[in-house]
Amino acid sequence: MVKAASGYRTSGNAGHRYSTPRHRKKQSAPAWLRHLVVLVVYAGAGVWATWPRFTWLVDGKLPATADVSGFVWNMWWLSHHLGHPGSPFFTSDMAAPTGIHLGFSTLMPLAGWMMAPITLACGPSASFAALTLITPGLLCYVMYRAARLWLNEPGAIVAGAFFGLSSMLLWQDWYHVNIATGSIFLPVTIEAAVRFRRRPHARPAVALGLSIGASVLINQESAVVAAIIATVILVPWLIWGLFTDRALLRQVGTPLMIGAGTGIVVASPELIGAIQAIAAGAAVPPRGVLAANYTQFGVPLPTLFAPSPRLSYLGLGRLASAYSYDNRYEKLEGLPTFGVVLSGMAVLGVASSWRKRSTWAFVALWLVSAALALGTSLTFGNCQISSWRSPGTYWGRTCHQYLPLMAHSYSTRVFVPAGPPAGVWKPVVVSNLMPYTWLVRVPGLAGLREADRFAIAGLIGTAMLAGTAVQWLSKRKWTTPLIVVVIGLGVLEAGWSGAARTSPGYHGVMPTALPRLDHFLSSDHSASIVVDFPYGLRGGVGATGSEFSPAAMLIATQDGHPRAVSYTSWISKVAIAGVAKHAFFRYLYEAERGVILSATDVSRARADLQTIRVGWVLMWRNVWTMHKPRWRYAYIDKYLTAVAFRHVKSACLAAGPLSGCHWNKRVWLYRYEPGAPKKAWREPVPVGSYHQRGQK
């Protein structure tokens, strides 16, 4: 190999040189200070872009969603498990008494371990809130670092802001912090892979392995995307070297092995937990459920480039309505839009730098990710729903779905107006022309069930192109002032402050503690199981039972009692079967569905309770609001009383005295008293019927 000339470095190919001017080193001597200033500015911008989230940290409030309470519980569990033997990827504190595997859940072990000091000092709710506050700044900073590989300082700074402060990512930061935090490692992976291509030594290879391994410990979906990006960056380069530079292949072999080994070692806790979950059946969901998810989360083409709903907070509701975020049929699992400003700047970036090879790499990342985000069909309109979910209700009025090269996937259960209460089984239709249809058929990738999240990877390419446009503007005196205009327009679409109260996406706010109930349960040190009702093993794939109150998992972190409910991304068959073995839970499921129990059923449930350590039941009377909720709650109260529970406490979820509290704003606390005299079971008279699907 020819020795590189002074002032240059090689990548194993003597004819390919990268300049490293010595004067640049002198100018950037205090590089750490510049990076620190950039990071601090980004952190402040992140707090502004998510306002009023910072005030909620002081006020002790959180978004009232099951996902958020699940993240808080995860923080508590990981800090609680530190110093204890056993795997953190299995817990008996959820789905008790059986327990449940967490290998395919949103556990975020790396974030939980890093935030453990705050969790132990201030509590898991404060730790979770702090994580959501620092994530936007980190997203901006890692994007800035990656952009500096190609762009000048102004272009890289703007690219970092467009990425980390986008509504798309900050929506995830509010409600799915695992997605936002996992996205940190996408630009890190790009930076490490490109640095390895430019200088194929052990240091960038180790950085690449650390990035992908750490991503596995945060969010497995992001890790898969990061691995795909690294493969696309490195494999074509290695194949080209196979024919043009064999010495390069000999040079990169050892560093790549070191990097791969580093990634495996870092990710090994999660990988072991995933293997255990696979053995428990957590990775074998019903095919029909996945097929339905594939169609649910595809993004209509206009939505990807629509104005951000953030504009509605600035009085620009007419512009924001193009996205139709407030449509009551919207599947609110994300905010997959690049925005008008960012899309326009990306086009300008292509026009200004179309001769550069890197520009077309960014274009490919943007457009390929956008094509994957479309899902299994090509849809035009201002909604994000699937034709099988609401046939004849909304679809076809403002949304039009096209299925070129249509094919049938697995069958799923469909609920149609005036149809059977149990639904009917119909095949899910997909388009074989869409790339996402083929991606999920690749072995090991079937779990990527939410197509809209691929737009996050496309956001990297879009931000890079926007930064390229800013770089072009910064090189000309007469266009430099336009950068201020670009920043001003970008601010209009940046950030997310939570859904408005009038939006279907508004879930309300919940306090981080309920002292009126906590002291009852905390004073009981028996470690008995608490059953929250409505009851179910909920979350993502394989969920059973009914949705339960988000506050249930929050107060579990206060009293330390195991919970019979669970909230995980994938529910294992072992957990479902283990719960079904217990007559108490089996008949609780049936009573929850409105099935009239017999005296024999109640006797079996009462006998089963004596074999498990259930001590309390919390009846959240604010969850069911439809289909004769008072009769249904009264029926469950009758069942609990018959199996030896006694109502001992009522608390109001709203501010004010209990006497003025509405019935569906209350929580009833029951205590198990096995010595209580038996009550004869009389089958209640059902008051009409209700649709089994509409339990909330």
Where are these regions (language model features)?
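Periplasmic/ER-lumenal interhelical loops and adjacent helix-loop junctions
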Residues: 65-81, 252, 265-350, 384-443, ...
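Hydrophobic, aromatic-rich transmembrane alpha-helices
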Residues: 235, 338-372, 469-471
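Start-transfer (signal-anchor) and selected internal transmembrane alpha helices
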Residues: 1-51, 253-261, 351-366, 481-486, ...
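Active-site lumenal/periplasmic loops and adjacent helix-entry segments of GT-C-fold
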Residues: 53-150, 155-185, 314-330, 398-399, ...
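Membrane-embedded helix bundles of polyisoprenyl
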Residues: 42-48, 131-149, 154-241, 255-271, ...
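Transmembrane signal-anchor helices characteristic of membrane glycosylation enzymes that use polyprenol
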Residues: 34-66, 73, 77, 259-278, ...
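Extracytoplasmic
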Residues: 286, 351, 488-696
